[in-house]
């Protein structure tokens, strides 16, 4: 289908809203009172460091709520204010942060139920309001909601929409979209729905496999089995990898996205030569500024002399996971938690090691003076970071008094 024409038609509908309802200041005031932190602002003003007792905190210089997340949450608050008596639904978590999503539930914003891995949109009625989250929604979902005639509030991050425009350009020129991302992630599901032919690659290892296939061929059935559920219907690696364009899930590791883009460019250059490269490869510029800033800040932070790192964000948050990867790659003991509730005052922490299930670590804060690096994902409010720091200070203070 012509997804570009559908988007244009949807945006002209009187039931579609993507710019709020004129109550932005009120919504932001409520948000600021709930999510901002005077302590975190104090640390920012003090060159991103604070020493209290035996603990020195080193904050990353870019962390926490990004503009797209702040916008999505503010629009959700504003929607509740503007429609105080109507039933409001979210098609997914508005962002990947448990406390923010719980706050919306407390405001009687409901989530579309999921039955056997499928969303049940039958619960939505014409008079209802449906919020599309920061990650966006698939074309199919938007069509369904538009057909129902309900009110649609679109909080999709503009950076995500920029990626949609890129894959639509690929489709228009008959290029296959190579999407660096997680094929099940809400954002990638939405992005792939705007693409024509596409293939989702998770990492450099998968990208190298694809590029080797482009140059040398291989077992098609093995290829299709390896990327099961990660390609468009009818995808054929023997014919659909002759012309490719690169796109990405905006929260992926910036350096890896760039490396994957260069790998595909070099692969097509090797196969088709410099004079014909532009007929087989489309370059890209879809790396989110906020993701890049947070990853760059983390790369600066790991250069400090740290005893350990605390990474705060939802366990299903892709951008938070990549911050954790950077810390581990640089040999720093790192703990990924989603809230201060994961820390108890007996010096235990329940955390999620990279690629593993939750586990509990006892005596995670060492004795004596320590320097703790701290960062948080783009969906984590400052107040959550403060709550984590207060737990750390309390544990070390109690130990010092023994």
Curated annotation (Swiss-Prot):
Molecular-function annotations in GO: 4 iron, 4 sulfur cluster binding; 4-hydroxy-3-methylbut-2-enyl diphosphate reductase activity; metal ion binding
Keywords assigned by UniProt, alphabetized: 4Fe-4S, Iron, Iron-sulfur, Isoprene biosynthesis, Metal-binding, Oxidoreductase
Enzyme type, top EC level: oxidoreductase
Cofactor note: Binds 1 [4Fe-4S] cluster per subunit.
Reactions it catalyzes: isopentenyl diphosphate + 2 oxidized [2Fe-2S]-[ferredoxin] + H2O = (2E)-4-hydroxy-3-methylbut-2-enyl diphosphate + 2 reduced [2Fe-2S]-[ferredoxin] + 2 H(+); dimethylallyl diphosphate + 2 oxidized [2Fe-2S]-[ferredoxin] + H2O = (2E)-4-hydroxy-3-methylbut-2-enyl diphosphate + 2 reduced [2Fe-2S]-[ferredoxin] + 2 H(+)
CDD domains (alphabetical): lytB_ispH
UniProt keyword annotation of 4Fe-4S present: yes
NCBIfam families for this protein: ispH_lytB (TIGR00216), PRK13371.1 (NF009911)
Name listed for the protein in its UniProt record: 4-hydroxy-3-methylbut-2-enyl diphosphate reductase
Lineage of the organism: Bacteria, Bacillati, Cyanobacteriota, Cyanophyceae, Oscillatoriophycideae
Gene: ispH
């Amino acid at each position: 289908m012509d997804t570009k024409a559908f988007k244009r038609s949807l945006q002209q509908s009187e039931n579609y809203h993507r710019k709020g309802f004129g109550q932005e200041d009120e919504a932001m005031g409520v948000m600021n009172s709930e999510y901002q932190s005077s302590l975190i602002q104090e640390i920012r003003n003090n060159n991103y460091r604070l020493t209290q007792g035996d603990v020195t905190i080193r904050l990353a210089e870019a962390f926490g709520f990004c503009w797209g997340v702040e916008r999505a949450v503010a629009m959700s608050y504003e929607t509740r204010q503007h429609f105080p008596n109507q039933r409001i639904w979210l098609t997914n978590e508005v962002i990947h942060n448990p406390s923010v999503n719980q706050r919306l539930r407390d405001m009687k914003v409901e989530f579309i139920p999921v039955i056997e891995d499928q969303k049940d949109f039958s619960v939505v009625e014409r008079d209802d309001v449906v919020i599309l989250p920061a990650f966006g929604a698939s074309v199919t979902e938007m069509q369904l909601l538009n057909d129902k005639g309900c009110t649609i509030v679109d909080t999709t991050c503009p950076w995500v929409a920029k990626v949609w425009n890129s894959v639509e350009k690929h489709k228009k020129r008959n290029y296959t979209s190579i999407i660096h991302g997680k094929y099940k992630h809400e954002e990638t599901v939405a992005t792939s729905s705007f693409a024509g032919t596409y293939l989702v690659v998770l990492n450099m290892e998968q990208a190298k496999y694809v590029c080797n296939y482009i140059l040398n061929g291989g077992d098609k059935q093995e290829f299709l089995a390896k990327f099961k559920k990660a390609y468009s219907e009818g995808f054929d690696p023997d014919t659909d990898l002759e012309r490719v364009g690169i796109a990405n899930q905006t929260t992926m590791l910036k350096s890896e996205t760039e490396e994957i883009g260069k790998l595909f460019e070099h692969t097509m250059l090797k196969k088709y030569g410099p004079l014909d490269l532009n007929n087989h490869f489309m370059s890209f510029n879809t790396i989110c500024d906020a993701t890049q800033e947070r990853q760059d800040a983390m790369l600066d932070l790991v250069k400090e002399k740290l005893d350990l790192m605390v990474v705060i964000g939802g366990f299903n948050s892709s951008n938070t996971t990549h911050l954790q990867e950077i810390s581990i790659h640089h040999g720093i003991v790192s703990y990924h938690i989603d809230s201060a509730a994961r820390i108890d005052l007996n010096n235990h922490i329940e955390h999620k090691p990279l690629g593993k299930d939750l586990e509990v670590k006892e005596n995670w804060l060492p004795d004596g003076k320590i320097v703790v690096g701290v960062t948080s994902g783009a969906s984590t409010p400052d107040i959550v970071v403060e709550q984590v720091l207060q737990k750390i200070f309390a544990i070390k203070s109690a130990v010092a008094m023994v």
